[in-house]
Amino acid sequence: NYAERYLFESTLRYDGSSRFPKNNKYGFFPSLAVGWRISEEDFFKENQSLDWISNLKFKASWGKLGNQNIGNYPWQTVFNLGQNYPYGDNLMLGAAVTTATDPTIKWEETETYDFGFESVFWNGLLSLNTSYFWRKTDDILYKPSGSVSSVLGQTVSEMNTGRMKNTGWEFEIGHRNNIGSISYNVNANFSIIKNKVLSLGVGNVEQLNGMVGNGSDLFIGFPMEMYYGYLTDGVFISNEEVKEWPDQSQLIPQSQKGDIRYKDISGPDGIPDGKVDPNYDRVYLGSRIPKYTFGLNLGAEYKGLDLSMQIQGVAGVSGMLEGFAGWALCGEGNVQKWQDEGRFDPNNPKRYPSYPRMQEVSGAAGFNTLPSDFWLLDASYIRLKNIQLGYTLPTKITTKAGISRLRFYVTAENPCTWNKYRKGWDPEINSDGRYYPILSTYTFGVNLKF
């Protein structure tokens, strides 16, 4: 720190982990940050037209971080017991190597660049911080199961394979003020994030439709945790319609009215071929990673009465309910109200019902429950995370009872959420329903200080 104008900070990390082999046990992860408080320069202070700017700092940083979030000793080849084999009339006890390992595994590295500024205006009345970040992760620790043929008879342990990039903007704005006996503050944040898979390394498997990835939720050029499935156009409203629709017998052996109509997107020649199949007709549908995240904190106080509120939300994110959460009669389970009310009714057929024809679905999936935009949901939401109202008795009253401070308060945590998701399900948790929901909690309390 030189004269509160020029700032420099650096960190040098040399970390070791027993989860990597001897030759790659250690990793070196440096970082540095610089800042320039231009508002402390003489030419800035002497310019009266800039008096409204109380503080202005430009900043930049660069750094590397390592990740060792894997199991213990994944690089070691071990024999697993219980690999028994019949020999004649006897069952012989056996052991075998069931996992292919990588003896050269090492630290996963993430490199980050960050540029931005911090500012304060009118002596703290308003603040604004903005930054742009570029983050790239190399040598991702991952199990590329799709890179190994099942004929091998072995699974794959973690190895360094794949690269990923995240870029985005972060904004923070704050305002605080006093008006008579009222003091208040408002702080908001907003971020834009773009995630992209650059490579899966040995997991780069080219699909017949030209996309390169693991065939399920990781593809080069797309975000992580993506939904990969079919485009649809409602359901069949008559059995005669089935004959006029592209052949989708590879998905539904015998389509009938009430079944989902899957679109024919492409074929071996790059154009629709009159058939719907998993090799050419699956596309990117959306991602579980939010593109936008935001938050708002509010606070106010008036003569002992105080109020605070925290709001949080995301947008530009997709969700999909599966299993017990999304499918009626799943594993001989229940039928939810929205499924019953929105299901296809053969007596009153609709092209775009909320649910296709009712049928029992196994625990795995059914013909009408394949990943598709029919089941895709907008998982954006705004949630009131916390709200608290309190009152502190005046000291002239509490001191008579020998109490220095007495405050009563009521708090509500997660009291309400605004979203377009299925009623009763939390858009923040993409699941098949086997989880405890986020609870709403209401509390009354007393703070007593002598």
What positions do the PLM features span?
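Extracellular/periplasmic, surface-exposed regions of secreted and cell-surface proteins
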Residues: N1-I220, F367, P371-F450
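Extracytoplasmic gating/loop element in the C-terminal half of outer-membrane beta-barrel translocons
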Residues: S17, V314-R407
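Short helix/loop capping segments that flank catalytic or ligand/cofactor-binding pockets
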Residues: N69, Y228, N239-E240, S308-Q310, ...
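Glycine-rich, aromatic-lined ligand/substrate-binding cores of catalytic
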Residues: L285-L321
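Phosphate-sensing "switch" segment of ASCE/P-loop ATPases
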Residues: I220-F222, K303, L329
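Conserved small-residue
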Residues: M159, N178-S287, N348
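Conserved SET/PR-domain catalytic core that frames the SAM/AdoMet-binding pocket
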Residues: N187, Y280, P290-G304, K385-G390
